[in-house]
């Protein structure tokens, strides 16, 4: 696992993957550790410090892009449902025109060379508008984890 506060590196595996294997992670694996981050988890697998890890795809891409390892060094055993990435938010008290300008600036990054360079630097292809409902999967995962505690 990556970090106790990580959605894709802790919460999602503890809820979704445990449904696949029919057991808690600590009962299924001989040892469960937190590495401190997705990149560190991918490197730990590559270096043989752990046998497997739950790593966000874009974080594995970071390790591959830096030349630390290649995709041939890994076998993907399970892929989770898609979850939304971290949002960019603004204060809702801003005037609607300014909010629209800020949103349009993000949504139009693909339209310029400078914007495309920024997207490449953050390992993204584009920004998309999100709604509160898009994050229901995160709320559902947390509710399922909390229910397991009780």
Q: What positions do the PLM features span?
A:
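Bilobed "Venus flytrap"/periplasmic-binding protein-like clamshell domains
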Residues: 1-42, 50, 58
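Second-shell loop/turn segments in exported
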Residues: 1-7, 46-50, 89-91, 124-129
């Amino acid at each position: 696992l990556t970090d106790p506060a990580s959605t894709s590196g802790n919460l999602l595996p503890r809820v979704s993957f445990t449904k696949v294997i029919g057991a808690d992670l600590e009962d299924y694996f001989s040892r469960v550790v937190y590495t401190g981050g997705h990149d560190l988890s991918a490197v730990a697998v590559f270096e043989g410090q752990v046998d497997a890890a739950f790593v966000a795809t874009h974080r594995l891409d970071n390790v591959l892009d830096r030349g630390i390892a290649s995709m041939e060094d890994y076998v993907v055993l399970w892929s989770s449902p898609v979850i939304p990435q971290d949002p960019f938010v603004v204060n809702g008290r801003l005037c609607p025109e300014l909010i629209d300008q800020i949103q349009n600036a993000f949504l139009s990054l693909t339209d310029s060379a400078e914007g495309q360079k920024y997207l490449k630097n953050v390992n993204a292809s584009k920004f998309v508008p999100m709604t509160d409902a898009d994050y229901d999967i995160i709320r559902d995962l947390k509710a399922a984890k909390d229910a397991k505690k009780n």
